[in-house]
């Protein structure tokens, strides 16, 4: 029996109209849908996707326990269990679609599972979604870059990388816990 494919599908930043046609097609064509969390309706990625693909609620739904913790052992254990759960379906020839916020290639939970699944011999594919920072710029009606400007996408927790004195546009990802410092650094840089 041919093994299934694990798809990491970005569902965009929150507006179901921003889901890509490919994301919608991949979700529609496959019967097993995975997402981080236990209850579908409490998971942001599921809530976005089900608005664009209402038939999603009738599919096989896999809520995967992927806690938001900094404990490396707990993370490794949860990711291993989630990958094994997905692999069980792949081994039966079923494709599995893992829903992730934004774009599947930018700070996505799926990329950790992707590595584990590939190590198990499974095929994976990433399906792009609209990144939150692109949607925010469009919502504000401002370009991220013009002409030869530089665009820097930086994790806000990496203080060494956040040098706001360099020219260009900065996108500081994962800034929630670091917002006070980001504001202070921005003010110090005259922004």
Which residues are covered by each model-predicted region?
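A contiguous loop/helix-start segment that scaffolds small-molecule binding in enzyme catalytic cores
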Residues: 6, 96, 164-191
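Class I S-adenosyl-L-methionine
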Residues: 1-16, 21-24, 28-122
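Short, well-ordered beta-strand core segments
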Residues: 32-33, 143, 170
